[in-house]
Amino acid sequence: MTPSSSGLEQSEIDAIQELEQTSRNDTLLKYHDICIDEGVIEQDVDMSCFSANSVGEWIVELIYQNNIKKLIMGATADSHYSEGMVHITPTKADYVIQHAPHCCNIWLVCNGNLIQTREGRFEHAGSAYSSSSSLHSIDSALIPYGGAGRAERVTEPHALSSSEEQSARGIEKMYYEEQRRRLEIEELKREKEQRDKMRRVREEALSSSSGVTKILYNEEVMRRREVEAELNRAKAEIEDMKRVQIELKEQHYADCRLLEKERDEAIKTTEELLRALEKGESSIPLQWSVSIEPPQCFICPISKDIMQNPHVAADGYTYEADEFRRWLNHGGEKSPMTNLRLENRNLIPNLVLRSAIKDWLQQHP
């Protein structure tokens, strides 16, 4: 079998040949087991597999090479057996009957029935062989489907012994098992042809304008879905950034208002002190005394010291940058002020507060 002659690819041909080889090996093993079950010494059982253009010619060649005296072979497949069948039709069996050596006894069986026999004839009287005993039991074991007198015999009909009958039935069963396997291989071939046909139809559909349009439409739908999903993720991130920005802006405004209030109070107190000094008052009212305590917004909530580098965290509060990073590095995942989980670890410099702290420190060395 070649790719050009069969229309199959080389890999498919190899697979079919491998399946056939496996089937042949299984059949030979069954033959081997039948021989062993019938008492044949295992060393006397020889299994061989040959490839030939003519099966009948090769069977005859094996008979001559191995000096075979008894041969049981299938006459035809079970599906070809008909009631009242008395003549063989396969070329293989007919060729063996005509060309096998005269000393070989041949029994042709089909579907459990004896179809034809050919007794061996011996030219030397000393080696004369009577097949009556070996053929006696086959008449009772392999009765033709249409009656006892249906089978054609070259000589007087006889029957196989019980063991030979079982062997014949086993060999016939294996022969038809081989046929079944061949049918399975043909079915696989038909299935492959059907798949190839469907593939060609599908390719033709895709090559048509409507098929191409449908494919392009589906691809466009998939791209739009991916873009929409990415856009939704980007919108969600922007909304989160806006929310954080609003919170930071509110905190910034609160700090500015506090600083303005403290500035106004400081200016007012300073003006009162100046007026008191100008009047020459020796004593200054207690409420005029300038507090040397820093404003609470200048104090880091973590270290309780005046901040040098204030930064706004994700919770909206201002911390000393180094102190807050140290807090995070030691496992702090929640806000020191709200005790809520921090959304991120980002810090934003609070430039206004840092400027105010710098001015205050210059006034209070």
Curated annotation (Swiss-Prot):
Superkingdom of the organism of origin: Eukaryota
Disulfide links within the chain: none
Statement: the UniProt record of this protein carries the keyword Cell inner membrane: no
Enzyme class at the top of the EC tree: transferase
Keywords, ordered alphabetically: Coiled coil, Transferase, Ubl conjugation pathway
PANTHER family reported in the protein's UniProt record: OS02G0152300 PROTEIN (PTHR45647), U-BOX DOMAIN-CONTAINING PROTEIN 56 (PTHR45647:SF62)
Described purpose of this protein according to its UniProt entry: Functions as an E3 ubiquitin ligase.
Protein name per UniProt: U-box domain-containing protein 56
Gene name tied to this protein: PUB56
